[in-house]
C-alpha cells in the first residue's frame, strides 16, 4: 500500500485484528516518491502507532531502492464467502477517500477456487515471506516513534494540508 493513514480505516483494521481476523499489511516506507526523498510520512508514523494500539495486526515494509511501492491492493479471504479484491488508484488517506482527488477503485468478487485469487495469494505470500528475493522488511526495521512525526501526520491527515 502506497499511502495508508485515514483514521477510520486504521481503526477498522485494528478492530478486525482484535476480533481474530488475520490482518497483514505490506506498506511503502514513504522514503522516496517520484524521485524525491521523503520523511516517512504518513505510513511510518501511522502504521507504527497502529501496531502499538493493536498488537495482533501484522505489518511489513516493502523494501524499495529509490522507487516506491505504489500498490493500492486490498485482498479479503473469507471462510464462507468468495474472495474480494479492491484495486485502483486511490490511496487510503482522507484527501483521496473524501473526493479531494479524482480516483477510481474497483471491487472484484471472485470465485473461491478460480485462478485469480490463487495468483493473488501466491503473490502476497511471495512478498510477505521473501520467497525468491528480498521484498519486505519487519516493521521494527523502520519504526517511527518520534513524537513530532506522529503529531505532524495527525495534523496533516486531519486537515488535508499535505500532498497525500
Please place each PLM-identified region on the residue numbering.
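PLD/PLD-like phosphodiesterase catalytic module centered on the HKD motif
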Residues: 7-164
Amino acid at each position: 500500500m502506497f499511502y495508508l493513514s485515514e483514521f477510520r480505516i486504521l481503526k477498522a483494521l485494528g478492530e478486525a485484528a482484535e476480533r481474530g481476523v488475520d490482518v497483514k499489511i505490506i506498506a511503502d516506507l514513504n522514503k522516496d516518491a517520484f524521485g524525491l526523498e521523503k520523511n516517512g510520512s504518513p505510513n511510518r508514523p501511522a502504521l507504527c502507532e497502529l501496531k502499538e494500539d493493536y498488537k495482533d495486526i501484522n505489518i511489513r515494509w516493502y523494501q524499495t531502492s529509490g522507487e516506491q511501492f505504489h500498490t493500492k491492493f486490498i485482498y479479503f479471504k473469507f471462510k464462507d464467502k468468495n474472495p474480494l479484491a479492491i484495486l485502483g488508484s486511490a490511496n487510503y488517506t482522507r484527501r483521496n477517500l473524501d473526493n479531494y482527488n479524482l480516483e477510481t477503485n474497483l471491487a472484484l468478487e471472485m470465485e473461491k477456487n478460480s485462478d485469480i485469487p490463487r495468483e493473488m495469494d501466491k503473490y502476497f505470500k511471495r512478498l510477505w515471506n521473501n520467497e525468491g528475493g528480498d521484498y519486505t522488511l519487519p516493521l521494527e526495521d523502520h519504526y517511527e516513534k518520534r513524537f513530532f512525526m506522529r503529531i505532524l501526520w495527525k495534523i496533516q491527515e486531519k486537515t488535508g494540508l499535505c500532498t497525500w
